[in-house]
Swiss-Prot record:
SUPFAM superfamilies: Thiamin phosphate synthase. Keywords: Magnesium, Metal-binding, Thiamine biosynthesis, Transferase. The keyword Metal-binding applies. This is Thiamine-phosphate synthase. It catalyses: 2-[(2R,5Z)-2-carboxy-4-methylthiazol-5(2H)-ylidene]ethyl phosphate + 4-amino-2-methyl-5-(diphosphooxymethyl)pyrimidine + 2 H(+) = thiamine phosphate + CO2 + diphosphate; 2-(2-carboxy-4-methylthiazol-5-yl)ethyl phosphate + 4-amino-2-methyl-5-(diphosphooxymethyl)pyrimidine + 2 H(+) = thiamine phosphate + CO2 + diphosphate; 4-methyl-5-(2-phosphooxyethyl)-thiazole + 4-amino-2-methyl-5-(diphosphooxymethyl)pyrimidine + H(+) = thiamine phosphate + diphosphate. The gene is thiE. GO terms for cellular component: cytoplasm. Pathway: Cofactor biosynthesis; thiamine diphosphate biosynthesis; thiamine phosphate from 4-amino-2-methyl-5-diphosphomethylpyrimidine and 4-methyl-5-(2-phosphoethyl)-thiazole: step 1/1. Mg(2+) binds at residues 72, 91. It comes from Thermoplasma acidophilum (strain ATCC 25905 / DSM 1728 / JCM 9062 / NBRC 15155 / AMRC-C165). The keyword Membrane does not apply. PANTHER family: THIAMINE BIOSYNTHETIC BIFUNCTIONAL ENZYME (PTHR20857:SF23), THIAMINE-PHOSPHATE PYROPHOSPHORYLASE (PTHR20857).
Length: 213
């Protein structure tokens, strides 16, 4: 996939850890439903399993010509030739990741605008703020004040995503903040119909959030 000119925006699916038989089916159905980007996130499996799963998820993403990211593991992203990697403050330092990885880099900025400014200056291609709601994916995570998003593009030019507990019921909360996309986990992975869930989220995102940017 050629990355030049690719706008990082839209509906961003972050996976659960690989554990269930229908893991790959969920991802493919979600893509059919409208997911624009997939990030493989797995905190529990050994590296050998993660390598195999990453390759399979990448094949699915390539089939539909959508961006494929790896969470945290820059070396794994290099090995499977992922389009991008997403890191945070507890992972490889951003300047180091930028030196060794030629693809796209996303950076978690939590509720910290200064961290977003740092990320842009050090080569990040997008930032992710949140969570702004309680989330089952990270039960102990702090919940941040949504007002950190106000006028965010006065401070940075790279795309801004939001993540954490976002679902069809609260996605409109982000209308008017100028964000570029939302990232979800449970809103798709916990839904019995991932394709429908993705389609509804995509419609709400484009009709009420991105249209108000």
């Amino acid at each position: 996939m050629k990355l030049e000119g690719r706008r990082i925006k839209g509906l961003y699916l972050v996976t659960e850890d690989y554990s269930r038989k229908n893991f790959f089916n969920i991802i493919e159905e979600a893509i059919i439903g409208g997911v624009d980007i997939v990030q493989y996130r797995d905190k529990s499996n050994p590296r050998s399993v993660r390598l195999d799963v990453a390759r399979k998820v990448k094949q699915i993403c390539n089939r539909y010509d959508i961006l494929f990211f790896i969470d945290d593991d820059v070396q794994l992203a290099i090995e499977v030739q992922a389009d991008g990697v997403h890191i945070g403050k507890d992972d490889m330092p951003l300047p180091d990741a930028r030196r060794i990885f030629d693809g796209l880099i996303g950076y978690s900025t939590y509720g910290d605008r200064e961290m977003a400014i740092f990320a842009e200056k050090n080569g990040a291609d997008y930032v992710a703020f949140g969570p702004f709601f309680h989330t089952d994916t990270k039960k102990d995570a702090d919940v941040y004040d949504i007002h950190v998003l106000e006028g965010i593009h006065k401070y940075i030019r790279i795309p801004v995503f939001v993540i954490g507990g976002i679902n069809i019921s609260n996605i409109r909360t982000f209308s008017g903040y100028g964000i570029d996309g939302v990232a979800v986990v449970s809103a798709i992975f916990s839904d019995p119909d991932p394709e429908r869930a993705a389609r509804e989220l995509k419609a709400a995102l484009y009709n009420y959030v991105l249209s108000s940017a």
